[in-house]
Amino acid sequence: MDKPFRIYITGKPGIGKTTLLFNIYRILKEKNWRITGFYCPEVRVNNTRMGFKIKSVLSGKEAWLARVDARSGIRIGKYYVVLEDNFVRQLEEEIFSFPDIILIDEIGPMELSSVSLKNLINKILTSNYPVIAVVHRSIKFDDGVIYEVTIQNRDILLEEILGRVTSNKNNI
């Protein structure tokens, strides 16, 4: 049996990893791919980062992942991880609803500090579904193709990754 299709996108903060993943999402969506997964946008109030949400790619449902003003939960930097297990269970149902591909933004220390989210990420990465994930630069995987986004290559990676994804769709 072939190994599951995996692409990991990594690089320095602010280099364009999320932008690249959202462009991949947009183009695959236009081609009628069924896309599931999650992403973790920052939440700002008056230009101050207050925390991060976690949002479903499929439904747009969201919950708090981490907040600066919480006082319980695992602390990562100035944020406290407050993700509720119930939301992760709902997210899991959506993610495994027969997708063509699963997108994750991102797999990092904050996401992995939630036991329920870490378990979901492990379940995704051990599934047979194809996955494209943005990965924190401190985390390494050896079961797929790794793209490091740089200023020099960030404009050409979109076509390269899309070519790899679409050429593999028949094998997915």
UniProtKB/Swiss-Prot annotation:
Pfam families in UniProt: NTPase_1 (PF03266)
Domain of life the protein comes from: Archaea
Keywords for this protein: ATP-binding, Hydrolase, Nucleotide-binding
Binding-site list for ATP: 11-18, 101-108
InterPro entries: AAA+_ATPase, Nuc-triphosphatase_THEP1, P-loop_NTPase
E.C. no: 3.6.1.15
Reactions it catalyzes: a ribonucleoside 5'-triphosphate + H2O = a ribonucleoside 5'-diphosphate + phosphate + H(+)
UniProt cross-references to SMART domains, sorted A to Z: AAA
Enzyme class at the top of the EC tree: hydrolase
NCBIfam families (alphabetical): PRK13695.1 (NF010248)
Role played: Has nucleotide phosphatase activity towards ATP, GTP, CTP, TTP and UTP. May hydrolyze nucleoside diphosphates with lower efficiency.
Stated family: Belongs to the THEP1 NTPase family.
HAMAP family xrefs: NTPase_1
The name this protein goes by in its record: Nucleoside-triphosphatase THEP1
Native source species: Sulfolobus acidocaldarius (strain ATCC 33909 / DSM 639 / JCM 8929 / NBRC 15157 / NCIMB 11770)
